């Protein structure tokens, strides 16, 4: 995070992940301006598919120019991800950073991206669904209303910051899997 990676290093890293005991890779259309999913997809294709029992985790993303994040945008986002990753379904599909959208009702309303996310799970486009965002208070409200399988939160549960404690306690108590992203504060606590 925070620096560019050339094609060779990216492919080498992705192959090393697939060859390791790791069984999950998390990405997004917005990571590397779309290059992250594309690079992962190229390696998946070269290898003849995903390794057995490997989980691709990616995210539905808002339109970065308009900040729009309704059901239509969510549907377009999954189509872009499936094409880039060269897979026909996603192991773990998150709704990404809804706190940055123009209008929260685009997310939570009856024609919102949340309803569309769960529809994608029903359709088999995603095996499991999650919520990925930073604002723990809003995240807690949302996971209390929707039957998520997982959450991913970043920089809110570190050695110095425990803002996600209530969120993680609720998730744990309700069998919602937790991915604690950036436990070293995006590298700040590791340098």
Outline where the language-model segments fall.
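N-terminal binding-site loop/beta-alpha segment at the start of enzyme catalytic domains
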Residues: 1-54
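Active-site groove signature of glycoside hydrolases
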Residues: 82-104
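Generic structural signal for well-ordered alpha-helices
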Residues: 14, 37, 41-44, 78-82, ...
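Beta/alpha (TIM)-barrel catalytic core signal, keyed to glycine-rich beta->alpha loops juxtaposed to Asp/Glu
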Residues: 98-191
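A structural motif
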Residues: 22, 87-90, 126, 148
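Active-site mouth loops of central-metabolism enzymes
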Residues: 1-8, 60-75, 104-106
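Conserved, mostly hydrophobic/aromatic
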Residues: 10, 17, 25, 40, ...
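Acidic (Asp/Glu)-rich catalytic clusters
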Residues: 19, 41-55, 82-88, 142-146, ...
């Amino acid at each position: 995070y925070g620096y560019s990676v050339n094609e060779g290093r990216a492919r080498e890293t992705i192959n090393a992940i697939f060859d390791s005991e790791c069984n999950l890779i998390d990405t997004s259309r917005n990571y590397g301006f779309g290059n992250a999913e594309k690079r992962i997809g190229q390696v998946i294709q070269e290898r003849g598919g995903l390794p057995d029992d490997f989980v691709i985790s990616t995210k539905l993303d808002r339109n970065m120019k308009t900040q729009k994040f309704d059901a239509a945008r969510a549907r377009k986002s999954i189509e872009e991800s499936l094409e880039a990753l060269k897979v026909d379904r996603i192991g773990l599909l998150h709704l990404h950073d809804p706190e940055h959208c123009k209008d929260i009702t685009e997310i939570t309303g009856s024609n919102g991206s949340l309803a569309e996310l769960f529809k994608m799970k029903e359709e088999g486009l995603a095996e499991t669904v999650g919520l990925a965002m930073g604002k723990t208070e809003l995240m807690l409200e949302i996971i209390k209303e929707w039957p998520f399988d997982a959450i991913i939160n970043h920089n809110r549960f570190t050695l110095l910051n425990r803002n996600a404690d209530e969120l993680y306690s609720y998730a744990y108590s309700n069998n919602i899997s937790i991915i604690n992203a950036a436990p070293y504060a995006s590298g700040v606590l590791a340098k």
